[in-house]
Amino acid sequence: MKKLEEYVRSIPDFPEEGIIFRDVTSVLQDKDSLKMSIDQMQENLNGLDFDVIVGPESRGFIFGVPIAYNLNKAFIPVRKKGKLPCETVEMEYALEYGTATIEMHKDSIKPGQKVVIIDDLIATGGTIEAITKLIEQLGGEVVKIVFLMELEGLMGREKLKGYDIASVIKYAGK
């Protein structure tokens, strides 16, 4: 059987020269690698005491929901601004060129809840840093962050010091 990283399609010079784009869609398009990715991410939660899983739009949904289902936990979506219908809390964060804003329902995290964040990729860490701030603003405690892939050269872990982070696949470059 192939190793999970063998299913990840690497596209050189995309979106710009010198970058190797790691394409998660090739993992999703194969039933074996999809199962393997969810199982391996979920293994990082064995024995962990937590209440809910949080995942950002959209690929955090893809991996977070099946793990939440498997572990009988609730799933809390983090969306782009303007996509949630009830009262929200929001956080703006820096992008390479400009800013973005994410939000969660104000009643989605209860004070004292232990939270796991699931996403497909950590690059610079900006999105996840903003999510941790939202969770903590609502009174939650981030007890683990799990990624399918990590681009170590972009130093995303530096923004998330103090958090327990696990990545299934690590790439040395950007």
Swiss-Prot record:
Chloroplast among keywords: no
Cite a GO CC annotation. Answer: cytoplasm
| Residue runs in coiled coils | none
GO MF term set? adenine binding; adenine phosphoribosyltransferase activity; AMP binding
Pathway where it operates: Purine metabolism; AMP biosynthesis via salvage pathway; AMP from adenine: step 1/1
Q: Which domain of life is it from?
A: Bacteria
Report the protein name in the record.
Adenine phosphoribosyltransferase
